[in-house]
């Protein structure tokens, strides 16, 4: 966590927000993910993809990284569950230090970052889905 100072006074603490997420593919895994509002899509490691039963991602997509480089990553769909909410979301498979929860998943789940409380909060009411996704 980083403390921001103004004239020697601490005015804010800036840190990363992590969230426990249950991901469902062919198999289900609960994982701690870094919430990244600068990432459009969620990104998981090949090992986590394998644990979800994603042996070969359905698609390959070209993405631009934060440093400007463009690379191809595998892409598939998983069901994300957070705090009683669930929604299908795109997961990219690539080398990451920790799993990333991107904006597409947050929007699908109806969640936003509350920086003051350092957690996710609802952005809208959530309607429970009774049908399947596929």
How should these model regions be labeled?
Residues 1-134:
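Pepsin/retropepsin-fold aspartyl endopeptidases
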């Amino acid at each position: 966590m980083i403390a921001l100072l103004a004239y020697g006074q601490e005015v804010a603490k800036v840190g990363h927000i992590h969230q426990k997420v249950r991901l469902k593919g062919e198999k289900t895994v609960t994982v701690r993910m870094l919430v990244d509002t600068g990432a459009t899509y969620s990104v998981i490691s090949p090992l986590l993809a394998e644990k979800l039963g994603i042996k070969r991602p359905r698609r390959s997509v070209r993405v631009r990284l934060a440093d400007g480089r463009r690379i191809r990553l595998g892409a598939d769909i998983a069901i994300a569950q957070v705090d009683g909410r669930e929604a299908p979301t795109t997961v990219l498979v690539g080398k990451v230090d920790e799993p990333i929860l991107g904006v597409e998943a947050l929007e699908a789940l109806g969640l936003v970052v509350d920086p003051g409380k350092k957690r996710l909060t609802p952005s809208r009411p959530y309607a429970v889905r009774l049908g399947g996704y596929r």
